[in-house]
C-alpha cells in the first residue's frame, strides 16, 4: 500500500455557510445534484443538532454543540467524495451519493475524540486511492481501534488492533485483526498499512 497521510478533522466554531464551505474543498466528480443533496443533508443535520456554538452555561463552558464538522472525503477512491459530519461527541454521520440519491453509511455515532472534550476530532488516514476513518483511540489503552473505509455501498473494517500495557510486567499485549502479535509485529503492520 502507498504511504498515506494522517488528517485530523477538528471542530471549529462555524455557522451554516461555513459548515457547507468546509466540505466543498474538493468536489471531485460529484455532480451538482450530489453537491445539492449533501448541502441539504448538512441543513437537515443542523436542524437536528443545531448550528455550531460554544456553550456558555454551567461547568461545560466552551464545549462545542451543534453541527461543527463537515468534510468531503473520498473513502473508496472513486473520485466521488463522501460527506462526513460530526455534531458534538455522539453525532458522527457519513453519507454517499450514487444513482441520483444520497444514502447514509453505517459508521459509529460516537466521535473518537483525539483532542479534548471541548473540541472533539475525527481522525482519517488518506492516500490517493482510499481514506480510512479511525474508530477508537490510538493510544495504549487496550480498547479496539478500527480503520474503516468504504467498499461498494458499505463501510467495512480494513484493520483492527488493540494495544495494552500489562500492569505487572509493563509489556505490551497486542492483537492485530483478532490474532495475538508482539508489539514489534503490530508496529511493523501499522507502518506497512499507513
Q: What is the meaning of each model-derived region?
A:
Residues 1-9:
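Bacterial N-terminal signal peptides that target proteins for export
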Residues 92-107, 145-151:
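Beta-propeller blade repeat segments, especially FG-GAP/WD-type strand-to-loop junctions
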Residues 76-86, 127-134:
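Acidic/hydrophobic-patterned starts of short beta strands in beta-sheet-rich repeat architectures
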Residues 109-113:
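Short coil/turn segments at the loop-to-beta-strand junctions that recur within blades
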Residues 13-17, 21:
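Hydrophobic core
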Residues 5, 26-36, 48, 126-194:
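Acidic, small-residue rich beta-repeat scaffolds with periodic aromatic anchors
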Residues 66-75, 118-130:
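Beta-propeller blade termini
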Residues 25-73:
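Terminal domain-start segments
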